[in-house]
Amino acid sequence: MPAPDPAPVRPALGIQGPVVAFHDPWAGDASDAVMRTGTGIPIPSQDPPPTPAQFVAALGDLGADFYVHHVLPTHEDPTAMVRDLTAGGIDVVLGNEYGNINGPYAEGTNRYDVPADTLRAAAASGRLVGVLYDEPEHLQIHADQYRRDAHLPHFGQTEGLGADEAIAVIDTTVHEIVGRVDAAVAGGGGARVPVLSEQVFPVMFHTLARAGMTPAPKVMKESFQPLQLGTALGAARQYDRELWICADLWGPDIGPWLTRAPGFPGHSPAEFASALRLAHLFAPTRLFVENIDVLVRHRGEGRFETTEHGEVWREFVTDFVPRHPLRWSHRDARADIALVHADDSDFGRGQRPFGNRAATAPETSRSVFAAWHALSHGQLPATGSCLHIPGYDFPRHRLNAIPRSEFPLAEGATEPTRLHGLFQATRGVLVFDEHVRADQLTDAGLIVVAGSRLPAATLAALRTRADAGATVLVASWLCDAAHARTERVGSGRWVVYGSLDEADALDALSAHLGPADVWTQRFGDHELRIRPASPGGETLDFEIADAAPRPLR
């Protein structure tokens, strides 16, 4: 792998713009002429509109280094916004969410691309630091989420295609998108910026990173944190990308806090505090919160009142981050356990793989869930990789009957619900796709191989790691005849399984899993140890320790 970059003292910190609290300060009344949330229900602005200067001052007061601005398709000229942000010393990320929801769309897709002229103008200021694609994996799989007139997946049509053919379609489109962004930014005289894949589902991270996008996982939301972060971090390491993290406050829970919409915020202030600390300690390039709506209330005339969640953010920015300078980068991440599997875009429902309505994901793709279940001491479900699977009923749905005109609510419930937590015990699990090389797996003492397909070259690379001392636990359906037998090879083990509850598989796992009450992740010579600080893992405790040396070569 490439040599790690020097560790930053901290990630750059950002805030995403308003979606229900008040108007976009530069678009004004036009903000309410489009839908700014993915709920499918128009929600009028709830607070008086701040002026651009007042809004930029509020961003500065909250400690924002950058602002995530989703472009309103009716107001694509960023000149005034960039001028005001520059005056406040704040960088900008341009996103495509509002266009995805409302159109216009790139031909033959449900995707809005920020126009080249908009990118050039922002780049000319020197303040553009990224271009964000909002939940592109979601909109590839669920192509009719917003656009209902035809089935047109985000990166292109995949009807009737197998996984490799569908990935080729996506790969071609992403290369074109990244190329267009690069050309527009260069045309404005700016330095190259990452094109972000901000994701809710823990699928397609590797597919999109391989094609040129930068992983930007959402924490909190409806995610399982070790699985979400282990997958995105593995993709960033395998494909040498930056890692951005979005602390997304939309979620399943309700409680005694200001509530702008059902499930917004859907995480308690205490959970938010732990999630921010977790994200910081994973040392991303940049970290931002979605959205400003739940950090402040605007009372008019530029008077912003910080909410309980806003006070959590302020404490994080002004106290926790300065007291915890980072001695590592996400590029220093090392796997104690590597999980290798191909991408079938299956998070548990098995439907519409890569947007193909005529197919379902292969049954063998579900072995990935079984692997995570085993690697987490049974704490992650064996049936899916996020909360959007059968068995989870979101408390936020209790608020759906309340007219949106009655929001914001002083509280969503008198007692908090706790469907979502932050903790499952895993031991340094990073995910790599089926194209991983042997030299990218040198730190892993255990390599678990699952999923639906595996190239012969990767099978040979895995055998090389077993020869060098690793235990390779590989699914029988992925092995050719020459590798279909459990045996000792070199100084390691090659263990073939049909099910992870077989005796040989359990033996291989037990030697590497670690304690059932600690989640760990190594970064170079440092080990981050995470423990639940409350029932259900709503809050976390953190410890930084020296990482034990690894004998593998």
Regions found by a protein language model. Give the residues of each.
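Intrinsic disorder/low-complexity signal
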Residues: 4, 133, 486, 516, ...
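Residues that cap or initiate secondary-structure elements
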Residues: 221, 345, 535-536, 548
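Glycine-centered, small-residue-biased loops immediately flanking beta-strands
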Residues: 470
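C-terminal beta-strand-rich structural cap/linker in extracellular carbohydrate-active enzymes
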Residues: 473, 538-553
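An acidic, glycine-rich "communication" segment
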Residues: 482-537
